[in-house]
Amino acid sequence: MAREKFERIKPHINIGTIGHVDHGKTTLTAAITMALASIGNTKGKNYADIDSAPEEKARGITINTTHVEYETAKRHYAHVDCPGHADYIKNMITGAAQMDGAILVVSGADGPMPQTREHIVLAKQVGVPSMVVFINKEDQVDDPEILELVELEVRDLLTSYKFEGEEVPVITGSALLALEAFIKNPKILKGENPWVDKIYNLMDSVDSYIPTPVREIDKPFLMAIEDVFSISGRGTVATGRIERGKIKMGDSIEIIGGSLRKTTTVTGIEMFQKTLTDGVAGDNVGILMRGIQKKEIDRGMVLTKPKSIDPLTSFEAQVYLLTKEEGGRSKGFTIGYRPQFYVRTTDVTGAILNMLSDDNTPLKIASPGDRITMSVKLIQPIALEKNMRFAIREGGKTVGAGVVSKLIN
């Protein structure tokens, strides 16, 4: 059966839910899709559809980032439900790297928790420009003053990481009670249930507060691969978000990663199971490639306009080292330290060869809370660029966040 064509009528925005484990991110995502389905723009998804990986269902927590789509009257959204569990912040980094804005979910019963802070730190680092707050589980809080305190705490936390804490829209509600109302009556309308109305209020805030991004359509095409599939009879598909540029059927593209550097031709482009004539920066797409075996390519590689970028192993970067309270290390580290560097959708081990303090004096030991310049050599080449953001991880912890300041050939 032929796929329907994707019609590009409204601005396309990538958004996501972030926040501490069990504060209600996936339930809220389900409630949003049900709310927008009831006004006719979206296919509703329940919690089980979004919490999709088998190991997630077993644990009841979200592991891989999951994409759903929905529309408001003003925009078309791709929504990534980011995992809240500490082991899976790796996926949060790749999910957040795709966000034009975020919904920070905080339980009104618990207030901000360690991962709330860690997700805010990461959102800032990977360049999420703005967020809206949903204080969830309002039905579990008897005293309205507690909700006011939670709101103040969240605003202060956002301000401390250079988000507009005073201006950020904060909506309180119960994702679960809204979702239950939709399950009872999928046709429920605005004004018929106070919990449902809070979900509409949230999406009105997202529409008005999160700016429509300016896409880098005129730059050379680049997409980091998030996943790879094989479609029998058609070939290999790489999925991801187009970071910049545009792509159409028949274009030549280069696959870069590790020791691989190979040119191929685009034979198909899809977004949310609909065909596209062309993909542009900001689109979450699947790109079908001619003559490529699934085993040749992997998550973390990039698809680019041929000869527009070189794979490198060495660079200098400006780095902030997270404090213990932010989820970072409790002790410092020395030259020779070998953590993982998370860049776009890849992670690769690298050695720190040199460190300078913020006044350019050589450092032997770097401590949590420091801002430093470091020279790094990765164990394998990746597509590196100046001003790229990355995270540094070690043993399940995010220990630092940086920006590439210089490429070394």
Curated annotation (Swiss-Prot):
The gene is tufA. This is Elongation factor Tu, plastid. GO terms for cellular component: mitochondrion; plastid. GTP hydrolase that promotes the GTP-dependent binding of aminoacyl-tRNA to the A-site of ribosomes during protein biosynthesis. It comes from Helicosporidium sp. subsp. Simulium jonesii (Green alga). Residues 174-176 are annotated as: G5. Belongs to the TRAFAC class translation factor GTPase superfamily. Classic translation factor GTPase family. EF-Tu/EF-1A subfamily. It catalyses: GTP + H2O = GDP + phosphate + H(+). It is found in: Plastid. GTP binds at residues 19-26, 81-85, 136-139. Residues 19-26 are annotated as: G1. The keyword Protein biosynthesis applies. Residues 60-64 are annotated as: G2.
